[in-house]
């Protein structure tokens, strides 16, 4: 260390501050060292390389206003120095910024930076409302709800089908105290007594009345001892898998800074990935649990259709709406599922088969938004299957054909659209301008799907569903959880529509047949900003095999991480 500040360093620092406050992207790019070794980190994650840092800045819309209160320089030599700045945000609170500056042919540039922003009480992109807790669970579980399979609603008891098996000895649907100490982020579609449902739409929330009863899916977790920490954001009316909300902002992707979090269960997913909750209570109609789980490296379960009661849940497309959970590990997911699914367990033979999904990626666009990754995604899943075989797990050598994926996805889209408009169309007509452009356009297209068209699509869908269900009777299907890694947060609507179309050709396989689907965070693909991004391997099981599917998923994850 030297005792003097190198010439020109402070001038460069103050140029950086001025550029930051004016959002001068060109100057900021010049003041950060070029190349793949430049680093910028904060509480959300680490950006590696100049290009990733530049893309992050371009997508965030400027830094919050602040002033520098203290400045500490520690020179390393004539051409390198550390600067630690204490900053005060205009909105209140203090933070710190640590930078390693190096002098080269282009003058002083930042090589490494770490930002500690003033602590936010609540991140409004993730949460609608939080408490400490918002709703307390029942410690030691639940005398309050001693329901077992015999007392469960008929819809839940029958969801597993005739072959689901008998209640497992000693297991109740809600295990007393099994979730003590766990915290839950509840997607803003579930009723919680005393709070209105907002569904990601401010105008809908403004007219909502506080619920008088709590949804069964929430009550089950509370009865097992979990606390509800808050109500988490969703895409508008849950009609998206991107994770963007034009009213409240985009929740951060904890695994890939600068990328989309995935939706529509974006808030619960980000809350869990960031450690702000241990369980995300969510819904999955066309992939809204599996996609954010894949994008953020989480475990995510779409349950058998009807396995978890949906009373107190704002629907989108009832034929496909399911309840499920997002967690950071398989053990917590298993406990959440046991606390919520009546005590009927169907076992699964540990036999697996890859699904031929090559048709899902036809017509992809250029890479850069996360689309165009079909080849890499297929290779990753194929290599995973080979590794499972090498570990002694029974994986069929030939992929299975689930039928015409394009026709399946289009039939699914038409039925989903018809039901979505039936659910929300009247309200949308009465509230022009209440939705953002992308979701408004999607509902506009849904309004054009008539009953005759939807009826034909439903008949085709039933034929596809029967074939898929038959394939899943004696093997667990393996396929990608999504069509790509997390797209760039700056992706255009056209780019996201391509990603959505390819992903829906995958997610509708389980959704059309009402089968449970588990996203296991066992794979990775190239990140949109370089490096690696998490990616989910999806396991699809027979109806009613939800609990066994999680256990098989844990075995698969263990085999792939050896």
Residue ranges and their predicted role:
Residues 75-77, 84-85, 99-112, 117-269, ...:
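Gly/Ser-rich catalytic/binding loops embedded in alpha/beta enzyme cores
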